[in-house]
Regions:
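Structural motif
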Residues: 87-93, 142-145, 189-193, 239-245, ...
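A short helix->beta-strand "capping" segment at the edge of beta-propeller domains
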Residues: 40-63, 104-108, 291-296, 344
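Conserved beta-strand positions in repeat-built beta-propeller and related beta-rich domains
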Residues: 71-73, 80-87, 126-128, 133-141, ...
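Sequence/structural signature of beta-propeller modules
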Residues: 2-49, 256-269, 274-277
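Beta-rich, blade/repeat-based domains predominating
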Residues: 61-74, 114-130, 162-179, 211-225, ...
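Short loop/turn segments immediately following beta-strands, especially the blade-tip
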Residues: 94-102, 145-153, 192-200, 283-291, ...
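Short, conserved, GDST-rich strand-edge loop motifs in beta-rich repeat architectures
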Residues: 232-276, 382
Length: 427
């Protein structure tokens, strides 16, 4: 998520690369005296500077945001992930039915605190049958399991850690086959685990490699009846090796040792294979393994896809529902859509109040569509068959209506442009 700069035009990875190059140039060109002083060794006394003081200024958003959304139709509750670090990452639980209000609504329950180990929680899946909630954290590379009744600063009942690469984005529970599906962005991968996993369990299957077409995968949905996997892709692509990114000590395949106690077999960084592809939805066989090609792809200018994120399926029409972050819209595609095809309907416009929608879910019991709108701190509820520029039926807010947009998400670097007197921050 990049400020409210147009995300599809300014890629965070590209901005980070520019900032890195700028920093190197400054260090080598502008401050040669620093380098000489360091080389002087004994000639220059070294001191440790401890900055134990509050900041002079703080640029931060203290309000929670909604990143992912999942609904327990039986209990009438909606679970939403807040990945905003400045407000304290959390999982917030609300009733699905409430009187319309513009006031900030307090959750029924909140899972948050150091014992939860949820980090930058990006995805949620529910199993009402087993009373379990599954959450993934992008920064920690963990899959946590909580009771659906959990509240407060509670540790997960189970945790899968040390196997999953960092930068996870989406999680889906295929209840029919008792399997969890997880997407990982930077290594372009889908991993499948047993729902009843134990710590350090290996994935049952992975989808990863140059043939897959995965390019910065985010949202994931499994149609257990058609035996198909749907994945949304932002389009940031590089060649990957099947199995790359697993954190398994000396047997690991990785391109960096960052964050690994035992880096394993480090693959070469260059030459670069990276490129920007159009955003897409790729579809695979549910049982695919290794480096398979997708069975079909939705991609092209007519699709209107622009940073597609959360994905689900309409249980009545079978349509595929996409949270289209880049242009503040919700797109609906036919179940078997393929190629450069337009959506069958679109939810978009000022009346919708959507700003940076990232999560979608359907409440089957009430025929309602829920949308997590990241930028403006709201979750909006619409009729399931909504189309066009339509106002939501009701809204959950975590900030006043006139609060500034959330803008900043996962900050990867910071630089100062002295010429323009501006701070550059890629998210």
């Amino acid at each position: 998520m990049v400020g409210r700069l147009v995300p599809s035009r300014i890629r965070p990875i590209a901005v980070a690369a520019i900032l890195l190059a700028t920093a190197v140039w400054i260090q080598t060109r502008q401050w040669p005296d620093v380098a000489h002083a360091q080389q002087g060794g004994a000639a220059s006394a070294r001191r440790t500077l401890v900055l134990d003081r509050p900041p002079v200024r703080l640029l931060s958003d203290p309000n929670p945001v909604f990143r992912a959304v999942a609904i327990d139709t039986e209990k009438g509750e909606v679970f939403m992930a807040n990945d905003k670090e400045s407000s304290g990452a959390s999982i917030l639980v609300y009733p699905t039915q409430f009187a319309p209000t513009d006031r900030i609504m307090e959750p029924r329950r909140r899972i948050a605190g150091p014992n939860t180990d949820i980090g930058m929680v990006c995805g949620i899946a529910l199993s009402p049958q087993h009373g379990e909630m599954y959450t993934i954290s992008g920064e920690t590379g963990t899959l946590n399991v909580f009771s659906m009744q959990a509240n407060g600063d509670v540790p997960p009942a189970r945790q899968l850690g040390g196997i999953i690469p960092r930068a996870n984005a989406g999680v889906y529970l295929d209840a029919a086959h008792d399997e969890l599906f997880i997407t990982t962005e930077h290594v372009n991968r889908i991993a499948v685990y047993r729902r009843t996993f134990q710590e350090k369990d290996e994935p049952l299957r992975i989808i990863q490699g140059p043939s897959t077409g995965l390019a910065d995968p985010h949202g994931i949905y499994v149609d257990s009846e058609a035996n198909e996997i749907y994945v949304t892709n932002h389009g940031n692509w590089r060649a990957t090796v099947t199995g790359e990114g697993e954190v398994r000590g000396p047997d690991s395949l990785t391109r960096t040792s960052l964050g690994y106690n035992v880096p394993g077999r480090v693959l070469p960084l260059g030459p670069s294979t990276g490129k920007f592809l159009p955003a897409s939805i790729t579809v695979y066989s549910r049982t695919a393994n290794g480096d398979p090609a997708p069975v079909r792809v939705i991609q092209g200018p007519r699709t209107q896809l622009d940073q597609p994120d959360g994905i689900t399926q309409d249980p009545v029409s079978g349509e595929i529902v996409i949270a289209n972050t880049g242009n503040d819209s919700i797109l609906f595609f036919a179940r078997n859509a393929a190629g450069d095809v337009p959506p069958v309907r679109v939810l978009q416009g000022a009346a919708t109040k959507l700003k940076g929608p990232v999560g979608v879910s359907i409440d089957r019991g009430h025929n309602e569509l829920w949308v997590a709108s990241w930028d403006n701190h709201i979750a909006a509820v619409f009729p399931r068959t909504v189309q066009g520029n339509v106002a939501p039926l009701r809204i959950i807010r975590t900030a006043p209506e006139n609060a500034p947009l959330a803008s900043m998400g996962r900050i990867g670097a910071v630089a100062y442009d002295a010429k323009r007197d501006e701070i550059l921050v890629p998210n």
